[in-house]
Every structure is written in C-alpha cells, then in structure tokens.
Amino acid sequence: MTRKTLAIEGLTATTVIDGQQRVLVDNLSLGVQRGRILALVGASGSGKSMTCSAALGVLPPGVTASRGRVTIDGVPYAANALRGRHVATIMQNPRSAFNPVRTMRDHAIETLQALGKLSSNPQDQIVHCMRAAGLEDVKTILSLHPFEMSGGMLQRMMIALALLSEAPFLFADEPTTDLDLVVQLRVLELLEKLVEERDLGILLVTHDMGVVARLAHDVAVLDHGRLIEQAPVMDIFQTPGHEVTRMLVSAHLSLYGMELNA
C-alpha cells in the first residue's frame, strides 16, 4: 500500500544582508511519509528550522520564500492551508509557545477554535488527546498556567494540542532540547508510539544524533541550506557518503569512545 507523502519541492528562502542577497535554504526537496520519521540534521545554522518555517509560511521578518511548493500526494497546498489542518507543529522551547497568563484549558479551546473544530462539548476531545500524549491528571493540568508546569509536561501538552488538529503530519523542531535525559526518553517514546498508532509522518529537526539513532527511519543532512545527503538511518551511521555527514556521525560516536570505520 502506498503511503501518503508530504513533499517539499525546490524550496528556496533568502534574505538580504548588507545589501547582498543570502540564500538560507537552497532549492531543497525532500519527502515525509505517513508512518515514518524523517530526521533533518545538520550543524547550527545549516537551515533546518528555516526549512520548516519556509514550508509552513511562518518566516521571520526579512526572510522570503522565493521559490518552491509543498504537495501532499502530488496536490499543491498553500502554506496557510497546510498549517494545523495537514501539518501540526511542536517547538523546541515549549515555554515560549504558551501564553503565560492563560491556562492549559484556554490554550486547548483556542486551538480548537483556530482549527474550526470546537464542538459544544470539547472536553472529550481534549481529554483524549492529553491522555494520548501521556498526561493523566487531566483536570488538574487543564487548570494550570505554563509557569506551574515542568518543561516535560509543557512538551507533552504541546503534543496534545498538536493531536487536536488530527493532522496526518507533524513537524517537530528540536522536541527534546532543554529536557533532562529521562524526560527526553519519554518524549521520544511518545512520538514513536504516535507514529505507530496514528500513522503520523514526522519531520524531526534535531542536532542530536543520539535522537536520530533512537527514533528516525530516514535522515536528510543539510549544509548551508542545501540537502547534501539523504538515506535510511542505518546507512547514515554505517556508511555516510558526504564529508559533513561523516563529521556529524564521527562526533556522535566519539562521545562514546567509538570511531567511524574507514
């Protein structure tokens, strides 16, 4: 059976610095399949997060997506039609994504309103998604403000809000950053479970090759905004083809006193 695929095609994003045009994402194409996790890796500043922002039309001021499109099974979608309905997002710093003066219930209701999915009795929808995200004491959590919650709880709540959209694809930008190792593992296990149970397709932006090894099916490597290598995860770790990929894998292995075979 053919899996539904989200394809980023020929994406280019540029900015102007000191009167000179600078390319931040350079004619990038890649595909994310439902039921699989594609890790987007590279050094800091390689264009990982910018790729997601450009694909979803949420670029910072001064940056323009000058070319490219996003399709699902060959059908092109405008960025505003993708966001929420077809692609949900979770961010690397969940604390900054929540309004500090509003409760988790407020955030859930606002999410449903923005998606046009608010029913007369939304409680069941909210509870179901929170439990799917591993949050059990739902009544208490819904009454909390962001400052009353740990980073791990906020990340799970962000995942729950993403699940409210029922989108088939998820862009996860550094979802384990600033979390301790135990919480990191729980978040990774949760994402893996959601892929299996909900057939989610995930584009996982990360600099952590340990996360890649644990979670990804496939890996795309960026360097200065260009896609330089894409392969199944085992091939990336065992036989990386590009020098930049070799450097990333070697640096990861050196943390454990290991070396990449020549």
UniProtKB/Swiss-Prot annotation:
Membrane topology: Peripheral membrane protein
Keyword Membrane (UniProt): yes
UniProt superkingdom: Bacteria
Subcellular location as annotated: Cell inner membrane
Molecular-function GO terms, alphabetical: ABC-type nickel transporter activity; ATP binding; ATP hydrolysis activity; nickel cation binding
Major location (coarse): membrane
ABC transporter domain mapped to chain residues: 6-249
GO CC terms, sorted: plasma membrane
The protein's role, per its UniProt record: Part of the ABC transporter complex NikABCDE involved in nickel import. Responsible for energy coupling to the transport system.
Name of the protein described by the UniProt record: Nickel import ATP-binding protein NikD
